[in-house]
From Swiss-Prot:
Taxonomy, superkingdom: Eukaryota
SMART domains: Ribosomal_S4, S4
Biological process, per Gene Ontology: ribosomal small subunit biogenesis; translation
Matches recorded under PANTHER family: 30S 40S RIBOSOMAL PROTEIN (PTHR11831), SMALL RIBOSOMAL SUBUNIT PROTEIN US4M (PTHR11831:SF4)
Gene Ontology terms for molecular function: rRNA binding; structural constituent of ribosome
Name of encoding gene: rps4
Organism: Patersonia sp. (strain Lejeune 1997)
Disulphide-bonded residues: none
The organism's taxonomic lineage, starting at the top: Eukaryota, Viridiplantae, Streptophyta, Embryophyta, Tracheophyta
This protein's name: Small ribosomal subunit protein uS4c
Chain ranges of the S4 RNA-binding domain: 82-143
Keywords for the protein's UniProt record, in alphabetical order: Chloroplast, Plastid, Ribonucleoprotein, Ribosomal protein, RNA-binding, rRNA-binding
Gene Ontology CC, one term: chloroplast
Any Pfam family matching the protein: Ribosomal_S4
Length: 196
């Protein structure tokens, strides 16, 4: 993880750690001119590691986004932002996306009153995300919310949370302008368009 954030910059979905800022020798050596291919590859890797996707999963999302009307890059980010594991992370119910994925896989999360154990489940507007009534599930979420470094005002406007009832609400489709990650999604689309 630390090698990834040193190379690609801050990846809040992967870890809460930040790369060290300093003018050490390594940073000076890295200022060598990068090729266009490498720039596109690094943007793709940033997106992949932030959301915790395999190469195959990301390629699938790029293909889906390409078939939808609108900017492929914007649609791609919207698809990734509306995944259940990412919504839990954005709500502050998990400290990282892999942590949110584990909550979903272990069947602690309900969407509209039904257990969902698929982290890639695509949330829709008006979906209500809650925990199971079991004490263990509530304790896990309570610990995450209590230790959350994300202040309430940083909650994206497409989400609402009630921390006392362990309940989140998806208000609308995510606006891809606010993803909390410095990324040029067009370079990711270009990377894949040149691969085929």
């Amino acid at each position: 993880r630390f090698k990834k954030i040193r190379r690609l910059g801050a990846l809040p979905g992967l870890t809460s750690k930040r790369p060290r800022s300093g003018n050490d020798l390594k940073n000076q050596l890295r200022s060598v001119k990068r090729s266009q291919y490498r720039i596109r590859l690094e943007e793709k890797q940033k997106l992949r590691f932030h959301y915790g996707l395999t190469e195959r999963q990301l390629l699938k999302y790029v293909h889906i986004a390409g078939k939808v009307k609108g900017s492929t890059g914007q649609v791609l980010l919207q698809l990734l932002e509306m995944r259940l594991d990412n919504i839990l992370f954005r709500l502050g119910m998990a400290s990282t996306i892999p942590g949110a994925r584990q909550l979903v896989n272990h069947r602690h999360i309900l969407v509209n009153g039904r257990i969902v154990d698929i982290p890639s489940y695509r949330c829709k507007p008006q979906d209500i995300i809650t925990t199971k009534d079991k004490q263990k599930s509530k304790a896990l979420i309570q610990n995450y919310i209590a230790s959350s470094t994300q202040p309430q005002e940083e909650l994206p406007n497409h989400l609402t949370i009630d921390p006392f009832q362990y309940k989140g609400l998806v208000n609308q489709i995510r606006d891809s302008k606010w993803i909390g990650l410095k990324i040029n999604e067009l370079l990711v689309v270009e990377y894949y368009s040149r691969q085929t």
